[in-house]
Amino acid sequence: MRIIGVLMLVASSFAPAAPCGGDLRGAVIAESANYLVAFRTQPPRIAVGKHFSVEFETCAKGDAPASTGVAVDAFMPEHGHGMNYRAVVKPAAGAKPADAPTIARYRADGLMFHMPGRWDFYFDVRSASGTERATRSVVLE
């Protein structure tokens, strides 16, 4: 019986970590050199001219330090302009899971896309080693 318990303990210590954003149903990934940002919008379907929020996790890759904060913005590359509103980013509940110290959870409120077209989400991830931008494009119809 002890052997089975020891084997189970050893096997559980090699279990893979949950993927970045594993708790965010429907999340998509933005990526930089040292970070993944898994995010989803609330509501899930963004409407032109309506405020929305972004729930997200930052996940450090390899030996990169954990994020200490994030700024969220969006830009329309074809039009050369960004949003007319500035997002307010706050740590989310359970912002630093004890079992995953290189993951941090946030919520950004007050975003609005004022016209249809391609928008690039910008996640500027701050850490002890500097700031990196993770990007992801979405098309709003």
Q: How does the language model describe each region?
A:
Residues 1-7:
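Sec-dependent signal peptide recognition
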Residues 18-141:
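Contiguous segments within soluble domain cores/interaction surfaces
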Residues 8-17:
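Hydrophobic h-region of N-terminal signal peptides that target proteins for export
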